[in-house]
Every structure is written in C-alpha cells, then in structure tokens.
Amino acid sequence: MSNTKPDPAEMDFSRVTWEKSPFSGGNDNCVEFGVIGDLVAVRDSKRPEQTPLVYTRGEIAALLAGVKAGAFDHLA
C-alpha cells in the first residue's frame, strides 16, 4: 500500500456524492465531504468549482478524534 496520495488537480470528482453536516443549516456556507475510492475529499460549498482537498481515511479519522476530544473547541 502506498502512502502517496494522487494530485487532487488530476482527479475526477464528477461522480462524487457530496455530504454536509445537518448542523450546517440551509445556506451555502458549509464544508462538504465526499468519498473517492480510499480517499476522502473536502470542499467549500461556496466554491464547488475549486479543487477539493484530499485526505486518507486515517487522516480524517485523526481529525474527527480531535474534534470529538474537544481539541479544536477554541476555534469556534
């Protein structure tokens, strides 16, 4: 298994189903997540035409663990 991620600018995101938190409300001011193979793409709903950021599932798991533990509460 390779630790190298593909260049997001060279990936096809056209078939990705994007999801956002139900807590984000009805506006377009959201972070959206989409699964693409073994990776998770992240984009800004206000700018869906921009290239998303791409993370491994392990990276997303570490982020979510930090969020759940309150590591980023000072940012809100």
Residue ranges and their predicted role:
Residues M1-A76:
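Positively charged, low-complexity terminal tracts
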